Amino acid sequence: MVPDQDGELRHDVCSLSTSLRLTAHVTSSIVHEQSSNIRYGENRKHGQRYAYHEPLPPEIVARCNGHDGKHLTLVTRNSKPVNVRLEKRGQSFYISKGWKKFVELTDLRVGQCVRFSVSSPSTLDLLILDKHGTSLAIPPSKRDLKLKSKRSTHQDSKGHPSNTDPGPSRIINRRVTKSESSANTQLLVQYFSKRYPIDHLEQLMTGRTEDIEVQTLVGPSVNMVLHTSTDHRCNLKKGWTDFALSNGIKLNTVCIFHFYKTTHLGVIVDIF
């Protein structure tokens, strides 16, 4: 039995991906090295909504080789891609043409936050967060979860797990290279022992410690342990560091965790 979005119980795959959608980050900031937070609002005048925003961060403009009149595509999980145009005002850049359409499609509200990430010189990936820092992205569907559970995982000649479905190269390429500094690794070990309030997970857990399958939507799964600490919080242990390294997760990376339970406890990690 699993509660649906209205709180009613139904027979199906047990999942917390919709109700939980935790946005985990390692510091008080959710700014990735290639992204920034922009706050948006709305004004009502003559019955119409007007969206306004601050200038795009200089690092975002630089990474997408921005210039006055440049056309970009905004990509978000909440709506279809939107073509926009950059406009330079003084020393700052704003999104002009196409912005109103994007606001209407995503229904941006006062106090929400948009996190930009440059995926190519002409494409910006956007993650929309509410005022509490919780992602408003659409979680994996039941079909995604079922496909993931059926996906076979094999081992290569060295005994490492490898998936038959390589998935989007955007995910695969997010690997930590050998040039990564040891300082990054140390920070990762220190801050990435993921912790979650127990009240969100107790309906899925049967004991104080439970085995859990951790995976990205397209990558191989890793078996870890979800442990309840004395301060009534849950921690991912025994494998998180290797998982983070192999998926390019480091300090200030934003991760969204979708917990579910079928025949076993699992979590799908979205990496931004």
Curated annotation (Swiss-Prot):
Annotated region of DNA binding: 39-132, 180-272
PROSITE patterns assigned: B3
Swiss-Prot/TrEMBL keywords: DNA-binding, Nucleus, Repeat, Transcription, Transcription regulation
Annotated spans, Disordered: 139-171
Pfam families documented for this protein: B3
Annotated GO CC locations: nucleus
Taxonomy, superkingdom: Eukaryota
GO molecular function: DNA binding
Subcellular location, record wording: Nucleus
Amino acid composition bias (Basic and acidic residues), ranges on this chain: 141-159
Designated name of the protein: B3 domain-containing protein Os10g0323000
Source organism: Oryza sativa subsp. japonica (Rice)
